């Protein structure tokens, strides 16, 4: 195979930035080792070239549903640095092959901590795909280690973007979709409701009610959930099922979320760990109590973000609670654990409704240890009582 044309790019909100010679000696952001972009890009290139591109061609064959061999030439490869985090330095890999284009995500771990997490994530993604066969997480295509880096080539969710809470000129909270290449899109509360609903549903679908395993950690500030909007200008689907206004949909008013699944679609980009949230002993706790604590944590953690993804910790509006409850219940009703034993679902709903407001507030206390030493904790502390009241109201009215 002839060597394909390979181009290095850096993603930005305004479009791709071609990498010039002067940029190659700049250090990666968020990297304590100060790895130069030159080493980063060249190591990625070496990883992709392994075994004369054969693993990469096999991955392209699976994505394009056509068998490619070493005789088929990759005419061009675009290696695009997408973002930089404390654990990984993700890139996207775009191939031009036989006149067709295919795109992958590539997680790159540089530090010892990042490499430990990525090794675990590779194994976990494979397990979750095997167990649940759901489309919400990226599928592993190639993984390996080279030049002291750990690599994971996985699905790229094309057309999906990060979202974050921000403040307008009047310091009013709003949600924005970060559409890299075209800028930022302001979202309505109705659209935000749908995003939180789907994110909550995804996490619940992957929850293991028998072993109490849960995908965590994740955080909106890290961009772990991403969103695709097919028709950004579409209005809410009228009417809501029971009155209510379109600015801030709630379960109490019977609002369904307002936007169809075809308009907004959510995916989860990572599964770093999969284990019980708290130190539950399987033979010593009722599985429904473990599920109860998953539910509490879901309602709480769904509200946390950082302003513009990097600023101060921010607390999402109340509609996020109703959205989390709706997404949780939708997923719960579809799980075999409850379908095979319908009485379990009713028993769990009775359990939720049995808590008084004061009991519900106290029940959050064990979860606070999860946030010890984080900037999330003070924000949770300031808002927890009102959050419990909102959740209690949603439980009593909706369930």
Locate predicted features.
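Catalytic activation segment of kinase domains across protein kinase-like and atypical kinase folds
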Residues: 214-232, 261-323, 327
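Juxta-kinase regulatory segment immediately upstream of eukaryotic protein kinase catalytic domains
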Residues: 1-76
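ATP-binding glycine-rich loop module of kinase domains
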Residues: 77-127
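Conserved kinase catalytic-core segment
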Residues: 183-218
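A conserved alpha-helical element in kinase catalytic cores
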Residues: 110-138, 146-147, 190-194
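Helical subdomain adjoining the active site within ATP-dependent kinase catalytic cores
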Residues: 1-15, 19, 306-399
